[in-house]
Amino acid sequence: MKTFQLPFGKTHCTLNVPDDRLQGVLVSGAHDYKPEADEGTLVDNALANPIGSPRLSELAKGKKTCTIISSDHTRPVPSHIIMPRLLKELRAGNPDIQITILIATGMHRLTTKDELIAKYGKEIAENEHFVLHDARKDEDMVSIGTLPSGGECLVNKVAINTDLLVAEGFIEPHFFAGFSGGRKSVLPGVASRITVLANHCSEFINSDHARTGILEGNPIHRDMVYAARTAKLAFICNVCIDADKKVIAAFAGDLEKAHETGVAFEMKLAGVPAKPADIVVTTNGGYPLDQNIYQSVKGMTAAEATCKKGGVIIMCSSCSDGHGGEDFYNTLKEANNLQDAMDAILARTRNETIFDQWESQILLRLLLNYSVIMVTDAPQSMIEDMHMHYAKNIDEACAMADKILADKGITNGTVTVVPDGVSVVVR
């Protein structure tokens, strides 16, 4: 018997798998990677040796204002480590520069004051100037061009009306943008809902290039790079993290060159070969990424990449915030026929995209090919409304999976475990 401690919210759940049924365990090399220095030193070294760019302190000279785009509460970016160093570097080059920290909420809810304190520490949260991006406020946006896909590129004016635009973030596999970080700080981070909807259209989500670990030929990535370049994002500081959300590498400098270097590092660690199985058990990496069902679809796609068609995906995710998107939830709840719901989404043109359509589309893709069981703190009715199976604990989920397979004539189905679904690129 093999035992696994799987991240679940701010704690863990225990999975036991018989030796003769275990097909494989897919784990990112980042989890065992031994960094060359402590977290702060890694970030310091990256800022001192930027890739394809002068130092940030040099860029700050002669500038009156600077906006730093920073990830929101749903992302495990160690801002308490990165942000003080960005502020110090900027003020070393220009003590009088006026700095605004713009929270890149994308299409998420707004970050609370308590969440800002938890993320940055009390000193920064209470003394620096913060602006919360709201993608639905048209009056906050300014048009800066047309995306390669044809959509209007509207970005928060706080990011545009500044002398120097900087971003912090982290690099991990992303289920349709290829990887997070870099250009994503602008789109979707601080872009208008109109621009996000155009970029996240069903046509692009349906592309074989809009998948985890793929940047080349990815239409979503192409739009994002355009938005970041056109917004004049001058400097980024991105980190890679391990399972404990600790920094293991840092990359600073030009938005594309630094990001590409970080992606190459991450890919070496995150790329794992598929181990096809009847049952795949995964998570969304625990808090903060498993706060809702919406975010948990990311981890499910890692399971999808190694689950046999018609198999069972078990997702262990706290979902303490519930579904995470009203439109996302309602699309699934109101779907009497899953294929009809998918066809309706695919029929929408780029300018007809609705809120959270992309997440609905990906979850529908999963549900049309697999049975999905959620081990979660979310209400059972919510899970069942969304056409998934609810299990109160992982043992019940495993028994349920065996029953689903037995009804298909499969006994003692094989099991692959992906302890952190958002950290791997399954190939």
Q: What kind of region is each of these model predictions?
A:
Residues M1-A46:
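N-terminal amphipathic/basic leader segments beginning at the initiator methionine
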Residues L116-M141, D340-R350:
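A glycine-rich helix N-cap at a beta->alpha junction
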